[in-house]
Amino acid sequence: MAEPLWSDSAITLSPSMLLVPASSELYDIDCNALHEGMRRTRVLYDFVRAAEDDNGADYCILDCPPGYTVASVNALFACDEVIVPAKIDGFVFDGLESVRAQIRSLRRARPDVRIAGVLVTMRNSSEVVREGETLLRQRGIPVFEQVIRRTDKVVETTFEKKPLIDYCPRSVATQDYRRWVAEYLGEELGHGEV
């Protein structure tokens, strides 16, 4: 069986944007890297640079689970910015501290990697979530103004295996993601562009 490669998992979203989604193939890459004694931390870095150079990609989105896996370390090593999606709950602060610790541990090799911001997801309007979000914003970590509201439509897309924008283009989460992308890119959305 051929060795899985990062490029095998890449999905072209547009001519200038690639997505490497979290998948079981990334687990296989993790296992292969462990067998090789962790010498492979530059594999994803090299893939991202090749995508930029060969394909003219402006953005490579690397979706990986939190934790100290080879895939996560590879993703942090390869990126310039980290966007941390976070559901406001009792675990969010520990998770953010873990991401910050991982980034600090890579500083010598990649001093410019930074947290672009925390993207609050699955947000509802309960008092405990509002209080947690306030605490998060007081932590000194950048937090995007735009939040992604909770809706069952997001869950439905996982069963349908369709992107949210195709499955339900008018859902509140779709609108929120569009606004967040505009915020991240520093763009202004005109009326009716959501």
Identify the meaning behind each predicted range.
Residues 1-194:
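P-loop NTP-binding core
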